[in-house]
Amino acid sequence: MKMIIGRKVGMTRIFKDDKVIPVTVIKAGPCYVVQKKTIDTDGYNAIQIGFEEAKKVNKPMEGVFKKAGVKPLKILKEFRVENPEEFELGQEIKVDIFAEGDKIDITGWSKGRGFAGAMKRWGFRGGPKSHGAKFHRELGSVGQHSEPARIFKGKKMPGQYGNERVTILNSEIVKIDVENNLIAVKGGVPGARGGLVLIRTAKRG
């Protein structure tokens, strides 16, 4: 199991074998192993890795970083692994752990669009545009008065749109630039430019 944390840089294209491949560029790492969790101590196997230097940390976290022998880090994420013994505290993780052609799963956070109506959020058709209609962008009926006299849970209604955790499975690494810590991944990646992304070896690859 390989993993790394990065930030989305943007999209471009790469020419390979006379084909144009749309790619997303991710600036990933370097990351450091901050903590190891085992079944004996925590009930499950995982490692915690850190990314990006932090300016200020509280005393308890300062102790955690000191124990791992790394500088204070801003972003900490946990990844489940089968054998935490394969990793050492303070170990550096860079993009060279991956190779071109590897299949990876990428997790990001979709663009937040705020409070949105049913037409934008769910793609509802809306009401009639003319002939005396006044419900142009409303969602329509949400239930009945007498039975069941309530709105069912999960009903598609207006609300917060976007800013959700999204995972893209089996993306392919097209190119790796070890010197600049860059990974070019085939296709799109969730989130805005500069958004945080988590990369791991594909589970179903």
Curated annotation (Swiss-Prot):
PROSITE patterns: RIBOSOMAL_L3. One of its GO terms (molecular function) is rRNA binding. InterPro entries: Ribosomal_uL3, Ribosomal_uL3_bac/org-type, Ribosomal_uL3_CS, Transl_B-barrel_sf. It comes from the Bacteria. One of its GO terms (biological process) is translation. One of its GO terms (cellular component) is cytosolic large ribosomal subunit. It holds the Pfam family Ribosomal_L3. Keywords: Ribonucleoprotein, Ribosomal protein, RNA-binding, rRNA-binding. Belongs to the universal ribosomal protein uL3 family. One of the primary rRNA binding proteins, it binds directly near the 3'-end of the 23S rRNA, where it nucleates assembly of the 50S subunit. Part of the 50S ribosomal subunit. Forms a cluster with proteins L14 and L19. HAMAP family: Ribosomal_uL3_B. This is Large ribosomal subunit protein uL3. It comes from Thermosipho africanus (strain TCF52B). The lineage of its organism: Bacteria, Thermotogati, Thermotogota, Thermotogae, Thermotogales. The gene is rplC.
